Amino acid sequence: MPQQLSPINIETKKAISNARLKPLDIHYNESKPTTIQNTGKLVRINFKGGYISGGFLPNEYVLSSLHIYWGKEDDYGSNHLIDVYKYSGEINLVHWNKKKYSSYEEAKKHDDGLIIISIFLQVSDHKNVYFQKIVNQLDSIRSANTSAPFDSVFYLDNLLPSTLDYFTYLGTTIKHSADAVWIIFPTPINIHSDQLSKFRTLLSSSNHDGKPYYITENYRNPYKLNDDTQVYYSGEIIRAATTSPARENYFMRWLSDLRETCFSYYQKYIEGNKTFAIIAIVFVFILTAILFLMSRRYSREKQN
């Protein structure tokens, strides 16, 4: 069977419970960021120290690096989806099997060599003081293909979500250069819009007429699941916590996109086919009303 490419959309109703998926032992208290890089495509932080064990892992996996992904807007930017819901961004923590292999390069040649932990970012009304430690370093790597010492005290434990139940599946690295076991925490961490927008000011390695682009987005779209790909989860809490709001938010975004399409048709045909333009603007008003009612209902549910 073909290799399962990453990222994917995780359908919570199809995920399989597995009694072997015990809580992970996360030992980031000794991890220290050494350098931060603008690779021209993403932000990468290299680490010394720190490892994960326990759960279903056969031994310790050493932390190597952290990668950050985002989108043009705050309402999308994660690589992985939960029930077709995209979060504002995603952090990937890359680990390798140091006990079994002599180096990261050797480990990535094997399907048990790499473990990648995924943490979702969700824009909220409050700044994340721990995530700000990363944001404060971005001015030193604004140009593409630059790196700088990470010159701030930073504790990676503080970026872990409040709930550590997880999904897992065998996929690939985002570049598809190696197999990797993914561990995905569906509970996001909250950050502020201003913090995420700072990443969009970084310069890309791509250019047009000699002028560099900004890295306004760098997330990847999900790949279709292979017939033999299995996604497992570690607890019932995941299913209850992710299904309803994720689908509702996605549906609201879809309605909003449809409204914008109808409005663009109205602007396009108002001087020509007035009948078509009137139909389009009627749909705009209808969709606006539906979105307003859904937004009020969703706000009441969050308050309750």
Swiss-Prot record:
Apparently non-glycosylated. InterPro entries: CA_dom, CA_dom_sf, Carbonic_anhydrase_a-class. It is found in: Virion membrane. The chain crosses the membrane at residues 276-294. Induction: Expressed in the late phase of the viral replicative cycle. Its main location: virion. One of its GO terms (biological process) is symbiont entry into host cell. CDD domains: alpha_CA. SMART domains: Carb_anhydrase (SM01057). Residues 1-235 form the Alpha-carbonic anhydrase domain. GO terms for cellular component: membrane; viral envelope; virion membrane. Residues 1-275 are virion surface. Residues 295-304 are intravirion. PANTHER family: CARBONIC ANHYDRASE, CARBONIC ANHYDRASE 7. Homodimer; disulfide-linked. Binds to chondroitin sulfate on the cell surface to provide virion attachment to target cell. This is Cell surface-binding protein OPG105. It comes from Vaccinia virus (strain Copenhagen) (VACV). The gene is OPG105.
